[in-house]
């Protein structure tokens, strides 16, 4: 779901530019990822993040408000620094597509609030630390089951001018892919068409990017506004740390031993 994140940054960038987003707290957006050599779409998304970085980091109107950083070859050594420093943990898989993960738990334990969908271990995080101490957005699994069979992303594209502006930047020459195969004429056309027309292996906007985008941006802006009250935000962080005990490996092993393996502890 990196593609919804890069589009949200463009949405905010152009909102700052046109004055519709005001009093924005300076924010650094950090991406860390890898792609298999032949995974063209992933390569194109990484290239797009680089182009967005060049755009917003150099613009005198936004360079003191937004920074975009892509960490190449993200690994444990980088994670040791970033996880401990992060204020916000973005866990933004489309609801129902993430089995679970541990990255969000590590960030929670280090005091980051979660900005994410109601998916994977995010569900347990908000159950433990409280939804009021985190930021949940987007359609839930049961809602998507009703939405997706009749979902037409073009309806959103042509009814929301701000989302259309963001998507148009992929094909109007504002951002160039620099020659990534299948994107045609130096644009990010394949990324655009994946959302509007689909591809050989999926329907249009298979991951409900456009459907969740407005909700995601509004959640992001709420985090941004809440961060101004440092004491209240710190309280959210501390409550996340204090309620991270469920994710202890000791608790997990004890539960497995009692409920799955049916074994008793042995004193050594």
Language-model segments: which ranges?
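Glycine-rich, often proline-containing surface loops adjacent to acidic residues and nearby aromatics
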Residues: 25-33, 85-88
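Histidine-anchored nucleotide/phosphate-binding helix
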Residues: 8-21
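Catalytic binding pocket for nucleotide-activated donors in carbohydrate/polymer assembly enzymes
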Residues: 84-85, 92-237, 241-246, 251, ...
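Catalytic cores of eukaryotic secretory-pathway lumenal/extracellular enzymes that build
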Residues: 30-44, 48-80
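Short, small-residue-biased leader/transition segments that mark boundaries at the very start
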Residues: 2-4
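Short, basic, glycine/proline-bearing loop/turn elements
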Residues: 64-65, 87-91
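Short helix-terminating capping/connector loops at secondary-structure junctions
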Residues: 20-25, 61-65
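A terminal-accessory region detector
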Residues: 8-11, 32, 40-47, 71, ...
């Amino acid at each position: 779901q990196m593609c919804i994140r890069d589009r949200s940054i463009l949405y905010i960038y152009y909102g700052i530019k046109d004055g519709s987003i005001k009093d924005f707290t300076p924010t650094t957006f950090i991406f860390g990822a890898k792609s298999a050599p032949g995974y063209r779409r992933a390569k194109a998304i990484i290239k797009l993040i680089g182009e967005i970085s060049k755009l917003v980091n150099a613009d005198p109107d936004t360079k003191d408000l937004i920074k975009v950083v892509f960490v190449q070859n993200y690994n444990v050594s980088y994670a040791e620094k970033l996880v401990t420093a992060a204020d916000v943990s973005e866990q933004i898989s489309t609801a129902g597509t993430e089995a679970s993960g541990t990255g969000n738990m590590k960030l929670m334990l280090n005091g980051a609030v979660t900005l994410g969908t109601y998916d994977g271990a995010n569900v347990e995080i908000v159950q433990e630390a409280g939804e009021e101490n985190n930021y949940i957005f987007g359609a839930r699994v049961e809602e998507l089951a009703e939405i997706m069979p009749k979902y037409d992303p073009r309806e959103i594209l042509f009814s929301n001018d701000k989302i259309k502006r963001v998507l148009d930047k992929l094909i109007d020459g504002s951002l160039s892919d620099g020659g990534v195969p299948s994107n045609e004429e130096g644009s990010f056309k394949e990324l655009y068409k994946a959302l509007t027309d689909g591809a050989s292996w999926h329907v249009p906007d298979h991951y409900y990017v456009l459907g969740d985008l407005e909700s995601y941006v509004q959640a992001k802006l709420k985090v941004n506004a809440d961060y101004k009250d440092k004491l209240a935000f710190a309280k959210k962080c501390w409550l996340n740390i204090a309620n991270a005990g469920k994710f202890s490996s000791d608790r997990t092993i004890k539960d497995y031993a009692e409920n799955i393996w049916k074994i008793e502890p042995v004193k050594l």
